[in-house]
């Protein structure tokens, strides 16, 4: 989006610990991101943000509060959470208004999207969101997914399966607004020699159970039976790393599987380390 000349103002609900930001690019992103929760913890800023929203339009402020209540799942706890989302939405909307933002896009359809849909209402701008799944499809009512789809200007699904699930939980009138944008890479940056016969495999991503690295390790054990000189390099880190390392050792293939950890120059490394 930035490459096309559009000004992008990054925002995040939570501020992760500084130690979690690896590499120059992530540290730069941290510095330019507006964090909603830390700002909302300042009572004066919170009151000022909602005060300005109230003065701009009492009707819209009250309508958005009613929407927050309506989008709750059953139970008192859920209502309390929705009120927190409304408070955070006021702070985010104030930031968007001061920066003259014309469209709000949110990543994922769960709690952060609950804040986004309310902030968009307060700021009187359209919003959209990207959904990966699959976890949210098990908690559709909790996250008011049909309401969010109905109110969104468009919804991005990362796969045909994801789009089908979004269609399942939305009114057919809104199906046309659900589009597919795959999580891909720039093909020109990752060209390889199609005539090569290398046996080096690379995985790049967060080591989390949903990413499927464990399946790749299982498959590698089968590959090594026919190609004992094959290797697998996993670039990335995460909660599933210890289990993946243990599984590689249990399969007896730990010498063929390398865990590279977090990397910043993945492309340069894998141009010489994979096929």
What are the residue ranges of the model-derived segments?
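Conserved donor-binding/catalytic core segment of Leloir-type glycosyltransferases
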Residues: 194-222, 233
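Nucleotide-activated donor-binding/catalytic signature segment of Leloir-type glycosyltransferases, i.e.
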Residues: 233-236, 242-263, 275
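A conserved catalytic-core segment of Leloir-type glycosyltransferases
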Residues: 15-82
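Short N-terminal targeting/anchoring amphipathic segment
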Residues: 35, 79-81, 92-111
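Acidic anion/phosphate-binding donor-loop and adjacent secondary structure
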Residues: 139-140, 167, 182-199
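Carbohydrate-associated surface elements
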Residues: 14, 161, 184
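Short alpha-helical donor nucleotide-sugar binding micro-motif in glycosyltransferases
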Residues: 149, 262-263, 269-274
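A conserved, positively charged/aromatic
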Residues: 2, 77, 127-153
């Amino acid at each position: 989006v930035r490459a096309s000349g559009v000004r992008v103002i990054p925002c995040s609900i939570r501020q992760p610990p500084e130690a979690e930001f690896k590499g120059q690019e992530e540290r730069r992103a941290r510095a330019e991101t507006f964090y909603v929760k830390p700002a909302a913890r300042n009572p004066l800023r919170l009151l000022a943000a909602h005060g300005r929203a109230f003065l701009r339009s009492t009707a819209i402020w009250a309508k958005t509060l009613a929407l927050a209540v309506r989008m709750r799942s059953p139970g008192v706890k859920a209502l309390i959470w929705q009120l927190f989302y409304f408070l955070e939405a006021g702070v985010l909307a104030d930031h968007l208004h001061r920066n003259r933002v014309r469209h709000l896009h949110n990543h994922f359809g769960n709690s952060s999207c609950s804040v986004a849909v309310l902030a968009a209402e307060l700021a009187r701008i359209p919003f959209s969101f990207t959904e990966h799944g699959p976890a949210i499809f098990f908690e559709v009512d909790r996250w008011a997914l049909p309401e969010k789809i109905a109110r969104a200007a468009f919804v991005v699904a990362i796969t045909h399966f994801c789009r089908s699930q979004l269609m399942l939980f939305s009114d057919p009138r809104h199906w046309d607004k659900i589009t597919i944008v795959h999580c891909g890479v720039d093909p020109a940056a990752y060209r390889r020699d199609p005539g090569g016969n290398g046996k080096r495999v690379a995985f790049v991503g967060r080591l989390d159970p949903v990413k499927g690295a464990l399946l790749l390790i299982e498959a590698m054990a089968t590959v090594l039976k026919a190609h004992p000189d094959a290797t697998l390099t996993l670039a990335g880190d995460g909660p599933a790393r210890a289990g993946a390392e243990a599984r590689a050792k249990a399969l007896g293939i730990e010498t063929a599987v390398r865990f590279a950890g977090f990397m910043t120059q993945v492309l340069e490394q894998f141009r010489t380390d994979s096929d």
